[in-house]
């Protein structure tokens, strides 16, 4: 005979385990817990006793409420409408019903109040589930149906036993179209069919009792509540006794008039009294499985539902231990509305939480499809402007062959190309600073004559500075290292009451950029050519610069006092480059001078003034100054100092100015003789103090009256320069990336260049960059004007670089730090020495080359077989010498058949280190015995040779 667990039996019968234990005990079976087992006989007795133990169904109705109930058949109607007669079927059942129903009194009053407030005239009571003691015999798939009615006289519905099987089959889940719900969640049947509520097996019937407020806001689909004692609960409120007074149907509802409900069931008789209020059809709470999830876990039949841990957690945060009955009716109703209004948006501290919607793809208007950029734009910013993903643009760039990232800077052309693929246009709205600072042409009557600006050019050591020194009658060449002019000098010379401004440029090949700048700011070029040397490479370069700038040339043939001077040969060589003397029918003035003997200097100055008169040089001194930076340097006492050649207007002390990316105020000015001046007119060179940084040679100097505008222009230039620097980074294609991987063994030499003036910095850096080869790359990682500081040493330490100082010295702390960190600092005064030393350092980075050195050769004349050694060759040294540790190759008919090391070298059984020419010896080859008479053994060694660039 099989056994059945009590817990499984309770689940099968749909009642609580304790109830099953009580019934088994009443039947005489000793079952103590849910894990106990009973036989089939006990199960049969317990199942057979279920109908006899079912108690009455009590439904209490207020004096003005009539309960309408759908019946499965017409035969059941008299029973439903008969007077209520409560007949307890078992002695224990009524007691359970009364005891368990007591705790539900507050909830019933609260629910009735909510129902009264929710409808207009009559009250609607919420259907409560039948207690387990009364409905223990009800099938797990059946439940009492809620009802709504209205009546003037009291009525009581009869309690009737419910059969074990329902009279009508269970209906499927009700569709939303046949459901009605009012805020407050009172379920109203609209169709006449019976809709029994199917409970989940093992859960037991619907609960009753005082559960407190539900988290779901008051929806209760548990059927009619069990009857309680009238004296415990007090009078129930009626629809007309609400404290707020009767509310007309549909008149005060903010939602407007409610639509009429579906037609009534023809089989059901109309109850006496007023017509029930028509209710609007809204969404009902979830049915079936979803409803069972909402109702919670198993509950005891017939008793008050006990809160589970989840229910307590939900109610504890909101109510903090207080029942919903302690809230006011209005607050409770508003909470019910908030919780069950599907269109209500939750609000927290005034902030709305809106549900995120799907992103709608829209096409921007034509005017919005124009992207405005300033010179450059990053890929991420361009993607943001176009509203697409940056990865799409990166893929497009990769298809074009460029490896880029989201922060890669695109120039205008690349941005146009990318944007056009997505239907966008790119417009360059960069501010043209040249237009802002452009000077309008002056009226002819405002122009005044100005001195000419003369630039002296020529090859190295052809006497340019000596000639200028002779003209100025001042010995400035003594301060130049090696007789080479290192940077531009600007000077004023007066002749016959007229001034001439001279610019001296270096002749070294590294100073090409400085010569080009000098040609652009000058009016006349004096080309100095040594009579004993002729036309040299820098002479040709100066001619090309002058022609490119459209500046007239005056040739000064210097050093005519030397015995080997040949001026005619110089004129002939100049003719080959398009410089034809006026004596030979050309348009170029040539003057033979001697700077050392001071010959024909005045004639040269007169020719300069004559050429200036022909050019009719004029300028307007009565306006804001504009000029060019000839040179910039960092003075230890005065800070950044700029040599400015004023070209237009007058520069005064106190003027605001813009120079490149710097803006400042002119604090002081002094001329080439060190004298302080308050104003500088056109064609006058001055040194300006007051700039925040060292400007680059060749920058335009503009004086302004508004400090704010000067700062704005400088800021814009800084932004533009930063964008251009980012865009300078080489765009690496896939092929270039592959080549870079292949060249992974290339050596790098990092260099930091510091000099006294900006021009020297440029010259040294450019000369060093030209030393780069495919084997060794030279990277100039930093250049600046001024002394070597601790910052430079830190940078050199981090980047493993050497520091080259040109005409400067390191600071004391920087020198100590360099010695501590092992940073190499090289100081030079002549650019040749710097270039040579760096070239040697680059050669030191190269791997040494192994070169074969020939030692000698020997002929095999006899072969000896030695046990445990092998074959030994008896040789005669024909040439050179054979060393013990030398490498050898075996030649047979001038073909190399073996190359390796010499195993043994002996003379008369003695090991020797070497054997010279003319001697005989025995030699054994390492791991090789195939030797024959007549073979030649050639000895050599590999030695390291330093690699050259």
Curated annotation (Swiss-Prot):
Q: Which part of the chain is the tr-type G domain?
A: 449-618
Cite the record's Low complexity compositional bias ranges: 152-162, 263-276
Task: List every stretch annotated G4.
Answer: 558-561
Show the GO cellular component annotation of the record. cytosol
Region (G2) residue spans:
483-487
Biased composition, class Pro residues, residue ranges: 163-172
Xref: PANTHER family? TR-TYPE G DOMAIN-CONTAINING PROTEIN, TRANSLATION INITIATION FACTOR IF-2-RELATED
**Matching HAMAP family:** IF_2_B
What is the name attached to this protein's record? Translation initiation factor IF-2
What lineage, starting at the top, does this entry show?
Answer: Bacteria, Pseudomonadati, Thermodesulfobacteriota, Desulfuromonadia, Geobacterales
């Amino acid at each position: 005979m099989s056994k059945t667990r009590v817990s499984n039996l309770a689940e099968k019968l749909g009642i609580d385990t304790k109830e099953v234990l009580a019934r088994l005990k009443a039947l005489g079976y000793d079952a103590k817990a849910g894990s106990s087992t009973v036989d089939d006989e006990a199960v049969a007795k317990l199942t057979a006793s279920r109908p006899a133990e079912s108690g009455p169904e009590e439904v209490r109705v207020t004096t003005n409420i009539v309960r309408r109930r759908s019946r499965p058949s017409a035969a059941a109607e008299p029973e439903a409408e008969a007077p209520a007669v409560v007949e307890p079927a078992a002695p224990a059942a009524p007691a359970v019903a009364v005891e368990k129903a007591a705790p539900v009194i507050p909830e019933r009053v609260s629910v009735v109040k909510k129902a009264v407030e929710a409808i207009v005239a009559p009250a609607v009571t919420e259907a409560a589930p039948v207690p387990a003691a009364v409905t223990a015999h009800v099938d797990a798939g059946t439940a009492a149906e809620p009802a709504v009615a209205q009546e003037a006289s009291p009525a009581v519905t009869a309690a009737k036993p419910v059969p074990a099987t329902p009279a009508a089959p269970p209906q499927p889940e009700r569709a939303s179209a046949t459901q009605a719900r009012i805020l407050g969640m009172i379920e109203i049947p609209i169709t006449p069919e019976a809709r029994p509520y199917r409970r989940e097996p093992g859960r037991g019937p619907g609960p009753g009792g005082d559960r407190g407020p539900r988290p779901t806001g008051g929806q209760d689909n548990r059927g009619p509540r069990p009857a309680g004692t009238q004296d415990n609960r007090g009078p129930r409120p009626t629809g007309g006794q609400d404290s707020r007074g009767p509310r007309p149907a549909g008149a005060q509802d903010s939602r407007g008039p409610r639509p009429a409900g579906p037609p009534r069931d023809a089989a059901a008789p109309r109850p006496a009294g007023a017509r029930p209020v028509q209710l609007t059809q809204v969404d009902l709470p979830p049915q079936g499985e979803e409803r069972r999830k909402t109702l919670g876990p198993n509950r005891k039949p017939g008793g008050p539902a006990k809160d589970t841990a989840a229910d307590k957690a939900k109610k504890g945060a909101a109510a903090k231990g207080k029942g919903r009955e302690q809230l006011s009716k209005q607050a409770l109703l508003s909470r019910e509305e908030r919780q069950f209004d599907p269109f209500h948006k939750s609000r927290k501290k005034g902030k709305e939480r809106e549900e995120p919607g799907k992103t709608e793809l829209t096409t921007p208007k034509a005017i919005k499809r124009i992207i405005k950029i300033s010179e450059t734009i990053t890929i991420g910013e361009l993607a943001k402007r176009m509203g697409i993903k940056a990865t799409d643009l990166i893929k497009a760039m990769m298809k074009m062959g460029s490896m880029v990232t989201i922060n890669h800077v695109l120039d205008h052309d690349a941005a146009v190309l990318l944007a056009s693929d997505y239907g966008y246009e790119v417009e360059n709205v960069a501010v043209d600073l040249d237009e802002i600072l452009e000077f309008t042409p002056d009226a002819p009557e405002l122009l005044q004559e100005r001195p000419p600006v003369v630039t002296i050019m020529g090859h190295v050591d052809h006497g340019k500075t000596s000639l200028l020194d002779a003209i100025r009658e001042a010995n400035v060449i003594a301060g130049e290292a090696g007789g080479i002019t290192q940077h531009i000098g600007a000077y004023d010379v007066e002749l016959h009451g007229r001034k001439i401004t001279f610019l001296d440029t270096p002749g070294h090949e590294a100073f090409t950029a400085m010569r080009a700048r000098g040609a652009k700011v000058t009016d006349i070029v004096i080309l100095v050519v040594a009579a004993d040397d002729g036309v040299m490479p820098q002479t040709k370069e100066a001619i090309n610069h002058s022609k490119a700038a459209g500046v007239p040339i005056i040739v000064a043939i210097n050093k005519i006092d030397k015995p080997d001077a040949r001026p005619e040969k110089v004129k002939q060589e100049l003719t080959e480059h398009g410089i034809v003397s006026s004596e030979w029918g050309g348009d170029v003035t040539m003057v033979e001078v001697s700077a050392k003997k001071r010959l024909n200097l005045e004639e040269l100055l007169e020719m300069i003034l004559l050429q200036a008169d022909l050019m009719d040089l004029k300028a307007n001194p009565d306006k804001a100054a504009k000029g060019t930076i000839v040179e910039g340097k960092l003075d230890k006492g005065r800070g950044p100092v700029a040599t400015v050649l004023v070209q237009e207007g007058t520069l005064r002390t106190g003027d605001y100015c813009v120079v490149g990316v710097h803006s400042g105020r002119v604090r002081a000015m002094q001329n080439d003789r060190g004298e302080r001046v308050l104003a500088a007119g056109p064609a006058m060179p001055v040194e300006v103090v007051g700039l925040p940084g060292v400007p680059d040679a060749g920058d335009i100097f503009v004086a302004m009256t508004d400090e704010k505008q000067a700062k704005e222009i400088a800021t814009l230039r800084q932004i533009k320069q930063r964008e251009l620097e980012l865009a300078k980074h080489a765009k690496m294609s896939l092929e270039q990336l592959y080549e870079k991987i292949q060249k992974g063994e290339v050596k790098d030499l990092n260099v930091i260049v510091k000099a006294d003036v900006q021009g020297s910095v440029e010259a040294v850096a450019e000369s060093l960059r030209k030393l780069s080869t495919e084997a060794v790359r030279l990277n100039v990682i930093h250049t600046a004007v001024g002394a070597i500081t601790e910052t430079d040493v830190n940078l050199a330490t981090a980047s493993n670089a050497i520091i080259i100082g040109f005409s400067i010295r390191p600071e004391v702390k920087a020198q100590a730090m360099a010695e501590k960190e092992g940073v190499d600092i090289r100081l030079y005064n002549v650019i040749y020495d710097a270039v040579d030393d760096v070239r040697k350092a680059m050669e030191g980075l190269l791997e040494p080359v192994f070169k074969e050195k020939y030692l000698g050769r020997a002929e095999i004349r006899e072969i000896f077989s030695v046990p445990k050694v092998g074959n030994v060759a008896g040789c005669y040294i024909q040439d050179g010498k054979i060393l013990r540790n030398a490498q050898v190759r075996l030649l047979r008919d001038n073909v190399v058949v073996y190359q390796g090391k010499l195993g043994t070298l002996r003379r008369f059984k003695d090991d020797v280190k070497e054997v010279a020419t003319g001697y005989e010896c025995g030699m054994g080859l390492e791991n090789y015995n195939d030797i024959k008479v007549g073979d030649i053994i050639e000895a050599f060694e590999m030695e390291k040779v330093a690699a050259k660039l």
